[in-house]
């Protein structure tokens, strides 16, 4: 998308699969050797490139909350404490990043889609789990937006980009009826894919493209 506008970006990927905010701050993780952490490398990068025009996307939070949603059940006593922890840890991360950033750095936070909506098509406990996950993910996105907003950082609305609130019924030939939001989830993630590819909570190529567009609408004119 940026290339189409004549803008050349050099990517520095600092993310690490399965990273929580806690492991980003303190380690350990499979991507960094102590004493380095993802956060320390990000701070160093920003200091070294202090005068550069830089875009930083921050995609954190889901793995901190997901400990409450494992085993296709929701531990309601877990959600509020984890969101309190998320708020405190993300504030710590954003404080370090913004202090290290130069005058030409743009930060964009990334909200999250709910990867469990497709379970609403199954009867029993998984259907209940899908319904209960909606409130938990909404709470998480509100918490993320509040923290990013306290640093004057916009947040890409990925949940809206994935049409999560669209509950209209879709009737398809030779297939069970479903809802628009579930249809989007099946297209934009691997949750409805057969083994060995799914079910997997991560985005498909189409999903990553939708997330990129949600970020792109927040970019300043120089990017």
Predicted regions mapped to residue ranges:
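A structural motif corresponding to the C-terminal end of an alpha-helix
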Residues: 1-7, 89-108, 139-157, 218
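Conserved SGNH/GDSL esterase-like catalytic core that processes O-acyl groups on lipids
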Residues: 1-88
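Solvent-exposed loop/turn segments at secondary-structure junctions
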Residues: 15-22, 60-67, 103, 112-118, ...
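Extracytoplasmic/secreted proteins, especially bacterial periplasmic and envelope-associated proteins
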Residues: 37, 41, 78-92, 96, ...
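Short glycine/proline- and charge-enriched loop/turn segments
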Residues: 73-77, 122-129, 189-193
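Substrate-gating cap/lid alpha-helix
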Residues: 85-87, 117-160
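Aromatic- and acidic-residue-enriched segments that line the glycan-binding/catalytic groove
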Residues: 166-183
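Histidine-centered active-site loop/cap adjacent to the catalytic His
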Residues: 179-223
């Amino acid at each position: 998308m940026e290339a189409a506008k004549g803008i050349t970006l050099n990517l520095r990927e600092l993310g690490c699969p399965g990273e929580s905010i806690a492991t980003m701050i303190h380690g350990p993780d499979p991507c960094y050797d102590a004493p380095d952490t993802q956060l320390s490398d990000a701070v160093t990068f920003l200091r070294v490139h202090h005068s550069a025009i830089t875009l930083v996307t921050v995609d954190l939070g889901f793995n901190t909350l997901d400990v409450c949603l494992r085993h296709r059940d929701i531990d309601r006593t877990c959600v509020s404490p984890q969101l309190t922890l998320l708020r405190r840890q993300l504030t710590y991360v954003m404080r370090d990043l913004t202090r290290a950033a130069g005058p030409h750095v743009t930060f964009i936070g990334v909200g999250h889609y709910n990867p469990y909506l497709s379970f609403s098509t199954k009867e029993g406990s998984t259907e209940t789990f899908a319904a209960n996950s909606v409130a938990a993910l909404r709470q998480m996105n509100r918490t993320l937006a509040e923290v990013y907003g306290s640093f004057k950082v916009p947040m890409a609305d990925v949940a809206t980009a994935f049409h999560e609130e669209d509950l209209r019924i879709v009737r398809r030939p030779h297939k069970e009826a479903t809802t628009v939001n579930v249809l989007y989830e099946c297209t934009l993630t691997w949750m409805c894919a057969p083994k060995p590819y799914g079910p997997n909570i991560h985005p498909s190529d189409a999903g990553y493209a939708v997330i990129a567009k949600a970020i792109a609408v927040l970019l300043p004119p120089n990017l």
